[in-house]
Amino acid sequence: MSVLVIGGSGFIGTRLCLRFSRYGKSFQIIDKARSEFFPEVVLRGDVREPLALNFSLEPTVFINLAAEHRDDVRPLSLYHEVNVDGARNVCDLARAKNVNKIIFTSSVAIYGFAPLGTNESGIIAPFNDYGRTKWEAEQVYKQWQSEDTKNRTLVIVRPTVVFGERNRGNVFNLLRQIASGNFLMVGDGLNRKSMAYVENVAALLEYSLDFKPGIHIYNYIDKPDCTMNVLVAHVNKLLGRSSEIKFRLPFSLGLLIGSSFDLVAKITGKKFPISAIRVKKFCANSVYESAIESTGFIPPVPLMEAIEKTVRFEFIEDHKNEQVFYSE
């Protein structure tokens, strides 16, 4: 088996390829960016364009991790070009190379403002272009699989927010605030957040290489979901501080402060780490469920251990000159 990892120079792709390298799996990467870890196996390519490439090893599986998902993507048409047109180009390449297995990372963003406990059968109601184009990309892959249902395998993984060492997304920003000692808890802290550790996501993608023909769709969440109180206390304890949260800001006051920063930002053009939407996101519940256990998959790293690994790497050990990934 030879795997082509499309978008393999990124955060999840790098972690996945490290697993492949560790366990002796053959792989190549297509990416518009150079891989700091595996430059020797990278083929430069952009999923927005037809992928006519010469491979040193003919792939038997495609894993597509390429995506546009930052909140500030401009022009907005990039979401469609990368997520939807990119899916079409991947499927065209699969047809040309007679590849019968595609693994695609979608997102729980397709559910939009989902009810607590939304699973794979949840209502599709994306509220932004990222979620909408991820859903549209899923339909492109389903069409490809429907052309030869007896032989083609499609795996769609919908992770919640992915965190881990080297990532500079929303979870890192929260951990950095806590580590700075300037973190202020807003609200009662009882709200829960579903999260996914990058090593576990990579392990699931690797595990799904053995799935049989058909369509396999799974949310991915590391359980159990922890409350903000538990998360903040755990991080403080790891940093050698008291786990007690001594002061809390009422949600209404936190929202007022966030709105004030929004006004100042609008007037001055400056960006601030506090905003009304960030206060709302922090205090909101975001809980998803998954049927992944039915496959027999067991995540290699428990959630609390994953948080510990991330905190140690980012705020205790010295990795300041190493590569990081900006994803959100």
Tell me the role of every PLM-derived stretch.
Residues 3-23:
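N-terminal Rossmann NAD(P)H-binding glycine-rich loop of SDR-like oxidoreductase domains
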Residues 111-112, 152-172:
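Flexible, glycine-rich beta-alpha linker
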Residues 128-155:
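Active-site Tyr-X1-5-Lys
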Residues 46-85, 89, 93, 111:
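NAD(P)H-binding glycine-rich loop region in Rossmannoid oxidoreductase-like domains
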Residues 89-129:
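Conserved Rossmann-fold NAD(P)-dependent oxidoreductase catalytic core, especially the SDR/UDP-sugar
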Residues 208-273, 301-328:
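Mid/C-terminal beta-alpha module of Rossmann-like enzyme folds, strongest
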Residues 78-89, 124, 132-135, 196:
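Glycine-rich NAD(P)-binding loop of the Rossmann-fold in SDR/ketoreductase-type enzymes
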Residues 167-173, 187-209, 216, 230:
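Substrate-positioning beta->alpha
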